[in-house]
UniProtKB/Swiss-Prot annotation:
NCBIfam families cross-referenced by the UniProt entry: PRK07314.1, PRK07967.1
Family listed: Belongs to the thiolase-like superfamily. Beta-ketoacyl-ACP synthases family.
Gene: fabB
Purpose: Involved in the type II fatty acid elongation cycle. Catalyzes the elongation of a wide range of acyl-ACP by the addition of two carbons from malonyl-ACP to an acyl acceptor. Can also use unsaturated fatty acids. Catalyzes a key reaction in unsaturated fatty acid (UFA) synthesis, the elongation of the cis-3-decenoyl-ACP produced by FabA.
Protein name listed in UniProt: 3-oxoacyl-[acyl-carrier-protein] synthase 1
Main location: cytoplasm
UniProt subcellular location: Cytoplasm
Gene Ontology biological process terms in this record: fatty acid biosynthetic process
Domain of life: Bacteria
Organism: Haemophilus influenzae (strain ATCC 51907 / DSM 11121 / KW20 / Rd)
Annotated Gene3D superfamilies: 3.40.47.10
Domain (Ketosynthase family 3 (KS3)): residue spans on this chain: 1-403
């Protein structure tokens, strides 16, 4: 079977606008969560989010940007960094053997609402303009990359709630294994807007107790957690066939040695835990080395965190690897989360450290003995690492990366 490796990546997240900034934040245990004035103005109960600290319109050509909502713009900037990081030429990007699978967990609620409000005015439908469709269509994040980057291989979006971009990466692996592509840009993006956030607020899923101390709001495994913190951003990884990467002398961050994808078949929003267990086992079926670290899904919800820990205990028994939740720093970027956390995990593997789970002041009893890392651990001896991503509808994804030693 054709082997797949990661040869580059790019990222826009609440803790940095490129891989160097993100690496520094991960090592420092730095939070990217802030109060969002719009959330306050709209009388939301939750005022906090993992915010993006850049204006994408300042970094993208106007003729390209006009088709984009924020999610597509974040993905575009992430892909630009990924291409540079991987050292790919224009010909290597634009050919029949190079494709693109990028997804989002939601559509652009902001741009949809802008269009709906505009049509109520005196100009009617003429006020909407010609770009609303490309900003709001479900495949916006792939379409708005494939055209400017002249992609000629596969080009589509996948969506599976908060597991979206992890599934995109796993699907990229399978496309290469099947021989359909040699290189696939894979990942996801999500806009951060009050229009989207208010829906999660309405269902009681997000944190409301830490509006005065936003940096402490995301606290996976702390006994006083009260919901996740929504975030935005984008992330793209370059998934490449091993021999293709070696032939062009590419830097190899890791080999993708395991991928699992399962469904709970249990509840629309509450995880079963059993589905996550099967997902990890499925991913581990092709792995011949011990797992040294797990970047858990760990969203800071009272139920979800415990269910995932239960699944980990069932899979690993008394040999639980070191675990941490990077969402404690970043918040939860929904459709971008899987790719965000794949990159966080790859940075840890490449630089041999484990980023901490921050804000654990009183450890939940269910997390006792679970080897949760709460301080940055240098010289961690990482060889094989796992990243979990789960979503509403009972969808699950697990990715396993291994240091490539030739």
């Amino acid at each position: 079977m054709r082997r797949t490796v990661i040869t580059g990546f790019g990222i826009i997240s609440s803790i940095g606008n490129n891989k160097e900034e993100v690496l520094a934040s991960l090592k420092a245990g730095k939070s990217g969560i802030e109060v969002v004035p719009e959330f306050v103005e709209m009388n939301m109960r939750s005022h906090v989010a993992g915010t993006i600290k850049l204006n994408p319109s300042e970094h993208i050509d106007r003729k390209v940007f006009r088709f984009m909502g924020d999610a597509a713009a974040y993905a575009y900037l992430s892909m630009r960094e990924a291409i540079e990081d991987a050292g790919l030429t224009e010909d290597q990007v634009s050919n029949d053997r190079t494709g693109l699978v990028i997804g989002a967990g939601t559509g652009s609620a902001h741009n949809q609402l802008v269009a709906c409000d505009a049509v109520r005015g005196p100009r009617g439908v003429k006020a909407i303009g010609p770009y609303a469709v490309t900003k709001t269509m479900a495949s916006s994040v792939s379409a708005c990359l494939a055209t400017p980057y002249k992609i000629r291989g596969v080009n589509y979006s996948m969506s599976s709630a908060c597991a979206t971009s992890a599934h995109c990466i796993g699907h990229a692996v399978e496309l290469i294994q099947l021989g359909k592509q040699d290189v696939v840009f894979a990942g996801g993006a999500e806009e951060l807007s009050w229009e989207c956030a208010t829906e999660f607020d309405a269902m009681g899923a997000v944190s409301t107790k830490y509006n005065e101390t936003p940096e402490k709001a995301s606290r996976a495994y702390d006994a006083n957690r009260d919901g996740f913190v929504i975030a935005g951003g984008g992330a793209v990884v370059v998934v490449e066939e091993l021999e293709h990467a070696l032939a062009r002398g590419a830097k190899i961050y890791a080999e993708i040695v395991g991928y699992g994808a399962t469904s709970d078949g249990y509840d629309m929003v509450a995880p079963s835990g059993e589905g996550a267990e099967r997902c990890m086992k499925q991913a581990m079926a092709t792995v011949d080395t011990p797992i040294d670290y797990i970047n858990v899904h760990g969203t800071s919800t009272p139920v979800g965190d415990v269910k995932e820990l239960g699944a980990i205990k069932n899979v690993f028994g008394d040999k639980i690897p070191a675990i941490s939740s990077t969402k404690s720093m970043t918040g939860h970027s929904l459709g971008a989360a899987g790719a965000h956390e794949a990159i966080y995990t790859l940075l840890m593997l490449d630089n041999d450290f484990i980023a901490p789970s921050i804000n654990i002041e009183t450890l939940d009893e269910a997390a006792e003995g679970c080897n949760i890392v709460t301080e940055t651990k240098e010289n961690a001896g990482l060889q094989t690492v796992m990243s979990n991503s789960f979503g509403f509808g009972g969808t699950n994804a697990t990715l396993i990366f291994k240091r490539y030693n030739g």
